[in-house]
Design a protein with these regions (language model features):
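Conserved serine/cysteine hydrolase catalytic core
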Residues: 172-212
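Catalytic active-site module of serine/aspartate enzymes centered on a nucleophile-bearing elbow/loop
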Residues: 217-273
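Conserved alpha/beta-hydrolase catalytic His-Asp/Glu region
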Residues: 127-188
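Gly/Ala-rich beta-loop-alpha elbow adjacent to hydrolase catalytic centers
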Residues: 85, 89, 93
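Conserved HGGG/HGGXW glycine-rich cap/lid loop of the alpha/beta-hydrolase fold
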Residues: 3-50
């Protein structure tokens, strides 16, 4: 009889302006080796979020980290968990990891916010000016990712008053939040991946230096990439993440090594993807 080998759980946590669909190009590849879970922490028109809002609750990073913990305890129950997060989702993961170190395996952070400096949040302009093309386009290095279908999808969402209220409440509770004071407290092996041309983060070099305070961090910078590496460079990201979580990423290719990138003052270095 063939012995069944349980796949380790990997939890995907998306960012502020993203939904679970943002992982569509990654999940099939990672599912070959891992049990992928995607908690819906930010369903902006969902009853759970609005019940919390109507009771006077704030939609904050600690609140989202608490919701993540409830999801894991009730529906996964197989620690330790590996985590892959994007943007704001990285703050949620680190908040959970510092509070529950024994339940966390490895961590991968994609374009994490809240490490250093300000953020240029296109979602605010999308809400205030109904400029959905700007909202979507500013996230990516190459504008063809901001196609008409994606722009139309956001336009439809923002016309839903309940969805828009959920976004606004989340913005008020999370904009400007920092996890800089947590970085030195993270004991886990962590891979941090940045887009060299990220226009959402105001200071990528400063953020890289801040991430160096994590005692077990390895860092990568991807040229010609914006704030959504998992979408823009999905093939490269899929390989890096899969190898890292399986202890097979022995070396960082020099073309994407963060230390080398900093020495070149952020100059783009060609990389085969």
């Amino acid at each position: 009889m063939t012995k069944f080998k349980r796949r380790p759980p990997v939890i995907l946590v998306n960012g502020l302006a993203e939904q679970s669909e943002s992982w569509n190009t990654n999940r099939p590849d990672w599912s070959k080796h891992f049990d992928i879970k995607v908690p819906e922490l930010l369903v902006y028109n969902g009853d759970a979020l609005h019940k919390h809002i109507e009771s006077g609750g704030e939609v904050s990073i600690p609140y989202l980290a608490e919701r993540l913990g409830v999801f894991l305890d009730e529906f996964v129950q197989k620690p330790p968990y590996h985590f892959v997060g994007s943007s704001l989702g990285c703050q949620v993961i680190l908040t959970y990891a510092v509070a529950n170190p024994e339940k966390v395996g490895k961590i991968v952070l994609l374009a994490p916010s809240g490490f250093h400096g300000d953020e240029n949040l296109p979602v605010i302009e999308g809400v205030s000016r109904a400029n959905y093309g700007t909202l979507v386009g500013s996230v990516f290095y190459k504008k063809y990712f901001a196609n008409d279908d994606l722009i139309a999808a956001y336009e439809k969402k923002f016309k839903d008053r309940k969805w828009k209220k959920g976004v606004l409440k989340t913005l008020r509770g999370t904009v400007g939040h920092s996890v800089a004071d947590l970085l030195e407290q993270v004991p886990h092996q962590t891979l941090v991946i940045w887009g060299a041309d990220d226009k959402v983060l105001s200071d990528v070099p400063g953020s890289i230096r801040a991430a160096d305070r994590m005692i077990r961090a390895r860092q990568v910078v991807i040229p010609k990439c914006g704030h959504a590496p998992q979408i823009e460079k999905s093939r490269l990201i899929n390989g890096l993440v899969s190898k890292y979580l399986r202890d097979k990423l022995t070396t960082i290719p020099p073309q994407i090594d963060a230390t080398r990138w900093l020495k070149h003052a952020g100059a783009n270095v060609p990389v085969k993807v």
